[in-house]
Curated annotation (Swiss-Prot):
Gene Ontology CC: cytoplasm
Family: Belongs to the bacterial CoaD family.
Coiled-coil annotated residue ranges, if any: none
The protein's name: Phosphopantetheine adenylyltransferase
Its biological purpose: Reversibly transfers an adenylyl group from ATP to 4'-phosphopantetheine, yielding dephospho-CoA (dPCoA) and pyrophosphate.
Residues carrying the site annotation Transition state stabilizer: H16
InterPro entries, per the entry: Cyt_trans-like (IPR004821), PPAT (IPR001980), Rossmann-like_a/b/a_fold (IPR014729)
Primary localization: cytoplasm
CC cofactor: Mg(2+)
EC number annotated for this UniProt entry: 2.7.7.3
Residues involved in substrate binding: S8, K40, T72, R86
Length: 166
């Protein structure tokens, strides 16, 4: 069975990678699907996020990165996926995730949502938190792959400012 793992991944974190790696052990193919949402202003473009994710999952032969727009259930059908993979960090995540799972089940009764709890060491981690730490010059290499940390640093601290910080 194939699964999709949808999200904004702005940026991808070790928490996301934890879910992807574990999902790859459960499913034949996992499509890491970057949602193209015209109503949001992400830090990284869709293309940048696709490249960041592709590099981060290169070691996983049954993971593939893609982007989509519109309903998740339609994308799942397009990819012939029988499951939507979702990660849960804390209890407060569950309420919204359950609401989305029930909506998706109503729209596509043959599609299951599979929840994986994030490993304990990543339970506090979010893309928003990573961006906040990076914005104030903190080291984010414990939270994201090194190529993503470099991209964050470049985004928040251009070359001119970088010289001042070092």
């Amino acid at each position: 069975m194939n699964a999709i793992y949808p999200g904004s991944f702005d940026p991808i974190t070790f928490g996301h990678l934890d879910i992807i790696e574990r999902g790859c052990r459960l499913f034949d193919q996992v499509y890491v699907a970057v949602l193209r949402n015209p109503n949001k202003q992400p830090m990284f473009s869709v293309q940048e996020r696709l490249e960041q994710i592709a590099k981060a999952i290169a070691h996983l032969p049954n993971a593939q990165v893609d982007s989509f727009e519109g309903l998740t259930v339609n994308y799942a059908r397009q990819r012939q996926a029988g499951a939507i993979l979702r990660g849960l960090r804390v209890l407060s995540d569950f309420e919204l995730e359950l609401q989305m799972a029930n909506t998706n089940k109503t729209l596509a009764s043959d599609l299951e949502t599979v929840f994986l709890t994030t490993s304990t060491e990543y339970s506090f981690l979010s893309s928003s938190l990573v961006k906040e730490v990076a914005r104030f010059g903190g080291n984010v290499e414990h939270f994201v792959p090194s190529h993503v940390a470099a991209a964050l640093y470049d985004q928040f601290h251009p070359v001119v400012e970088r010289d001042r910080l070092t």
